[in-house]
């Protein structure tokens, strides 16, 4: 609810009471094709994003100055200033509407830090949606998407959710039909991987012509498998051009991938730039079994069971007054 601070004649004079909480999902790349290094330092990407039920909670409330607090595993390693994408999202949204970014942001982390699941991008998307709601701005979805794309390649998908085909740097999205709920086991590694370092390692490996590094095929079979809803069909088609680079930098991930398949997963893949490994399972009970076995295998820090696709960044309804 908005109440006028003075005569309410301008948007900046309206103050909103309370707070807004947004849930936003992590992602798994079911397919990731990485083009050669461009002159601008980026790579053209074609990817199939898949939002999974591993959710960060972003709460925004009005304050005297912009501040950011994060809680959850690994949160202490994250900067709580302009180096953080969530902070920059608040500044960008405020600039877009001509206001000061005077909000207090609290993020409860469940998506692993530096895990290849776009947790930082998810938090930035959560801030955009939360501020739009808290300040009752009515910024349309297409404009939120444009702001998200300014922040980073993975931020638009965190808004979009579901399953989507991404192109360009990953920010150009087309919705993909997925006829089933797919069940995943996510294995979090003992340490993170820097996305720029993984891309750099891929460039280095590709420059070594003696390696003959394989590349993913076209994405159409993956899209067909999603439309069919058959997890076994999809499992055979999972592919990630960044996986060899992630394995080169973090060889222990090979043990994790092997252990997950030996535990009964249909297939395993490094998610994005890693080091989180995502295992597709035949069913929800199968995922629980795989998760239990993988937990005891000693090959990763933490195991989570998740499903997808799920919605993108969305406001959590406030509890109704009794």
Curated annotation (Swiss-Prot):
Transmembrane segments: none annotated. Pathway: Isoprenoid biosynthesis; isopentenyl diphosphate biosynthesis via DXP pathway; isopentenyl diphosphate from 1-deoxy-D-xylulose 5-phosphate: step 3/6. Pfam families: GHMP_kinases_C, GHMP_kinases_N. ATP binds at residues 112-122. It catalyses: 4-CDP-2-C-methyl-D-erythritol + ATP = 4-CDP-2-C-methyl-D-erythritol 2-phosphate + ADP + H(+). Disulfide bonds: none annotated. Signal peptide: none annotated. GO terms for molecular function: 4-(cytidine 5'-diphospho)-2-C-methyl-D-erythritol kinase activity; ATP binding. InterPro entries: GHMP_kinase_C_dom, GHMP_kinase_C_sf, GHMP_kinase_N_dom, IspE, Ribosomal_Su5_D2-typ_SF, Ribsml_uS5_D2-typ_fold_subgr. It is an enzyme of class 2 (transferase). Keywords: ATP-binding, Isoprene biosynthesis, Kinase, Nucleotide-binding, Transferase. The active site is at residues 27, 154. One of its GO terms (biological process) is isopentenyl diphosphate biosynthetic process, methylerythritol 4-phosphate pathway. Its EC number is 2.7.1.148. It comes from the Bacteria. Belongs to the GHMP kinase family. IspE subfamily. Catalyzes the phosphorylation of the position 2 hydroxy group of 4-diphosphocytidyl-2C-methyl-D-erythritol. This is 4-diphosphocytidyl-2-C-methyl-D-erythritol kinase. It comes from Mycolicibacterium smegmatis (strain ATCC 700084 / mc(2)155).
């Amino acid at each position: 609810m908005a109440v006028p601070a003075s005569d309410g004649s301008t948007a900046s004079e309206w103050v909103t009471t309370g707070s807004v909480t947004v849930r936003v999902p992590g992602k798994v790349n079911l397919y990731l094709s990485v083009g050669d290094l461009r002159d601008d330092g980026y790579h053209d990407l074609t990817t199939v994003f898949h939002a999974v039920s591993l959710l960060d909670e972003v709460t925004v409330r009005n304050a005297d100055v912009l501040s950011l607090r994060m809680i959850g595993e690994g949160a202490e390693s994250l900067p709580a200033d302009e180096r953080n994408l969530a902070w920059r999202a608040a500044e960008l949204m405020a600039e877009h509407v001509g206001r000061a970014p005077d909000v207090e942001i609290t993020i409860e982390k469940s998506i692993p830090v530096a895990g290849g699941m776009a947790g930082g991008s998810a938090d930035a998307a959560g801030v955009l949606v939360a501020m739009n709601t808290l300040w009752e701005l009515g910024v349309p979805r297409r404009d939120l998407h444009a702001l998200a794309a300014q922040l980073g390649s993975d931020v638009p998908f965190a808004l979009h959710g579901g399953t989507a085909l991404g192109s360009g740097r990953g920010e150009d999205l087309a919705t993909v039909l997925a006829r089933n709920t797919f069940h995943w086991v996510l294995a979090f590694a003992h340490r993170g991987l820097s996305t720029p370092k993984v891309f750099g390692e891929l460039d280095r490996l590709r420059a070594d012509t003696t390696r003959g590094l394989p590349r993913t095929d076209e994405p159409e079979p993956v899209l067909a498998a999603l439309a069919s809803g058959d997890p076994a069909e999809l499992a055979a088609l999972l592919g990630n051009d960044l996986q060899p680079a992630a394995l080169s930098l973090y060889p222990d991930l090979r043990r994790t991938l092997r252990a997950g398949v030996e535990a009964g997963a249909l297939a395993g893949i490094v998610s994005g730039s890693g080091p989180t490994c995502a295992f597709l399972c035949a069913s929800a009970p199968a995922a629980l079994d795989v998760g239990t076995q993988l937990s005891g295998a000693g090959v990763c820090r933490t195991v989570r069971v998740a499903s997808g696709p799920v919605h993108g960044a969305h406001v959590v309804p406030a509890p109704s007054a009794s």
